[in-house]
UniProtKB/Swiss-Prot annotation:
<comment type="subunit">
    <text>Part of the 50S ribosomal subunit. Forms a cluster with proteins L3 and L19. In the 70S ribosome, L14 and L19 interact and together make contacts with the 16S rRNA in bridges B5 and B8.</text>
</comment>
<dbReference type="GO" id="GO:0022625">
    <property type="term" value="C:cytosolic large ribosomal subunit"/>
</dbReference>
<keyword id="KW-0689">Ribosomal protein</keyword>
<protein>
    <recommendedName>
        <fullName>Large ribosomal subunit protein uL14</fullName>
    </recommendedName>
</protein>
<dbReference type="GO" id="GO:0003735">
    <property type="term" value="F:structural constituent of ribosome"/>
</dbReference>
<dbReference type="InterPro" id="IPR005745">
    <property type="entry name" value="Ribosomal_uL14_bac-type"/>
</dbReference>
<dbReference type="InterPro" id="IPR000218">
    <property type="entry name" value="Ribosomal_uL14"/>
</dbReference>
<dbReference type="GO" id="GO:0006412">
    <property type="term" value="P:translation"/>
</dbReference>
<dbReference type="InterPro" id="IPR036853">
    <property type="entry name" value="Ribosomal_uL14_sf"/>
</dbReference>
<keyword id="KW-0687">Ribonucleoprotein</keyword>
<dbReference type="Pfam" id="PF00238">
    <property type="entry name" value="Ribosomal_L14"/>
</dbReference>
<keyword id="KW-0699">rRNA-binding</keyword>
<comment type="function">
    <text>Binds to 23S rRNA. Forms part of two intersubunit bridges in the 70S ribosome.</text>
</comment>
<keyword id="KW-0694">RNA-binding</keyword>
<dbReference type="InterPro" id="IPR019972">
    <property type="entry name" value="Ribosomal_uL14_CS"/>
</dbReference>
<dbReference type="GO" id="GO:0070180">
    <property type="term" value="F:large ribosomal subunit rRNA binding"/>
</dbReference>
<comment type="similarity">
    <text>Belongs to the universal ribosomal protein uL14 family.</text>
</comment>
Length: 123
């Protein structure tokens, strides 16, 4: 459950370390985002010589949440922290070329197959 002002870790090599959600996309009064939802973020902490810099406003897809994802069989997949993958604002494809840590199977649609293929583990 990601909402405005939530701080997230970044699970790719775009150069950002910490980001903050500034808007949940997909509806005029939508409050929460879960795994697979697109959010608008601003970079709060970045490494030198990265692809992004502090203060940039971009889109990102949520890949891990502490709240977790409930599967149809009743099981819940939870993680230790909230993480996202930064996307290009126009094409909505990942900026980074590597993904760190596991991602969930809920990302497996036409939009995010690139993230699934780059991820080291799909749960």
């Amino acid at each position: 459950m990601i909402q405005e002002q939530t701080m997230l870790n970044v699970a790719d090599n775009s150069g950002a370390r910490r980001v903050m959600c500034i808007k949940v996309l997909g509806g005029s009064h939508r409050r929460y985002a879960g795994v697979g939802d697109i959010i608008k973020i601003t970079i709060k902490e970045a490494i030198p010589r990265g692809k992004v810099k502090k203060g940039d406003v971009l889109k990102a897809v949520v890949v891990r949440t502490k709240k977790g994802v409930r599967r149809p069989d009743g099981s819940v997949i939870r993680f230790d922290g909230n993480a996202c993958v930064i996307l290009n604002n126009n094409s909505e494809q990942p900026i980074g070329t590597r993904i760190f840590g596991p991602v969930t199977r809920e990302l497996r649609n036409e939009k995010f197959m690139k993230i699934i293929s780059l991820a080291p583990e799909v749960l």
